[in-house]
UniProtKB/Swiss-Prot annotation:
This enzyme's EC code(s): 3.5.1.108
Essential cofactor(s): Zn(2+)
Family, per entry: Belongs to the LpxC family.
The protein's annotated pathway: Glycolipid biosynthesis; lipid IV(A) biosynthesis; lipid IV(A) from (3R)-3-hydroxytetradecanoyl-[acyl-carrier-protein] and UDP-N-acetyl-alpha-D-glucosamine: step 2/6
HAMAP family: LpxC
Organism of provenance: Cyanidium caldarium
GO cellular component terms, semicolon-separated: chloroplast; membrane
Name of the gene encoding the protein in the UniProt record: lpxC
Keyword tags: Chloroplast, Hydrolase, Lipid A biosynthesis, Lipid biosynthesis, Lipid metabolism, Metal-binding, Plastid, Zinc
Enzyme class (EC, first level): hydrolase
GO biological process, one term: lipid X metabolic process
Binding site for Zn(2+): H80, H240, D244
Protein name: UDP-3-O-acyl-N-acetylglucosamine deacetylase
Catalytic activity field: a UDP-3-O-[(3R)-3-hydroxyacyl]-N-acetyl-alpha-D-glucosamine + H2O = a UDP-3-O-[(3R)-3-hydroxyacyl]-alpha-D-glucosamine + acetate
Function of the protein: Catalyzes the hydrolysis of UDP-3-O-myristoyl-N-acetylglucosamine to form UDP-3-O-myristoylglucosamine and acetate. Involved in the biosynthesis of lipid A, a phosphorylated glycolipid that in bacteria anchors the lipopolysaccharide to the outer membrane of the cell. The target for the lipopolysaccharides produced in the chloroplast could either be the cell envelope of the eukaryote or the plastid membrane.
């Protein structure tokens, strides 16, 4: 195992999905063994304190994963960027955020992935990162959502979704083995966009949520059909669930080895899974 960082900084700006506020994010190289951390530089009333991707700093996982110390010093929507970081196997980065939320961009991780590749990823040293292995089988369920974890020799995910009232989606299952070394699947996962019911999104917008949502940064369906198709590939919605799960699993650490079977997964149950893994690690 090795440590990886980037050769030069990269910057991008964009709108936040939930707040609608424009944010700028700059990603810098970092020294070996330092890890990944975020800094909010736009808050003049607070000292600049690193926010480290960790289960201890999860403030909210209802609609997305929010990290921070309190609501005023937090970072919203980390999962798409963290998924790109994991798929790139990066271990050491300093990430400066000017704004409350990481930009949604096109609703997937592909722009993040390409941005990191443009920054030229390289090996800095041998890694001392802990490889997290699950030695037991366990089951987590919330209503009709569940995740089962099995011991495995690498990271593998089998996930399913079920939208019986939407003919465009219906039931989808996808299995991806050896996730972090399966280069064939990497672009497909990273390109998968977030999605939702057009009518429900409009209701949430009127309630003050999803202020940055539009038909460019999210797939929307209505009356069983896509409002802004076509899909980039078959099972794009199911693959986006894999993308989100990879991003949330990055809170465990760099290298994870287990086989997950998930059904109707969301950020809340993903957070429960990560917290359970952390308890096993003690």
């Amino acid at each position: 195992m090795y440590n990886y960082t980037i050769y030069h900084p990269v910057k991008i700006s964009g709108r936040g999905l939930y707040t609608g506020i424009n944010s700028t994010i700059t990603i810098y190289p970092e020294l070996p063994h330092v890890g990944i951390y975020f800094l909010r530089t736009d808050l003049t009333d607070y000292p600049i304190v690193p926010i480290i991707p960790s289960t201890l700093l999860v403030l909210n996982s209802k609609l997305s994963t929010v990290l921070g110390f309190h609501d005023d010093y937090s970072i919203m929507l980390i999962e798409h960027l963290m998924s790109a970081i994991s798929l790139s196997q990066l271990t050491d980065l300093k990430i400066i955020l000017e704004g409350p939320e990481i930009p949604i961009l096109d609703g997937s991780s592909i722009i993040w992935l390409k941005l990191l590749q443009q920054a030229k990823i390289y090996i800095t040293s041998l890694s001392n990162c802990i490889i997290f292995k699950s030695s037991c089988t366990f089951f987590i369920q919330t209503k009709d959502t569940f995740i089962i974890s099995f011991p495995y020799t690498s990271l593998a995910i089998n996930t399913g979704i079920d939208f019986k009232n939407c003919l465009a989606i219906k039931s989808q299952w996808i299995t991806i083995l050896d996730l972090l070394i399966n280069r064939f699947e990497l672009v497909g996962i990273a390109s998968s966009r977030t999605f939702g019911d057009f009518n429900q999104i409009n209701i949430l917008i009127n309630e003050g949520f999803f202020q940055g949502a539009n038909l460019y940064n999210a797939l929307a369906f209505q009356l069983g059909n896509w409002c802004n198709g076509p899909l980039r590939f078959i099972c794009e919605p199911a693959k986006h669930k894999v993308l989100d799960l990879i991003g949330d699993l990055r809170l465990l650490g760099v290298y994870n080895m287990f086989f997950l079977i998930g059904y109707k997964t969301n950020h809340f149950v993903n957070s429960q899974l990560v917290q359970f893994f952390k308890k096993l690690d003690k």
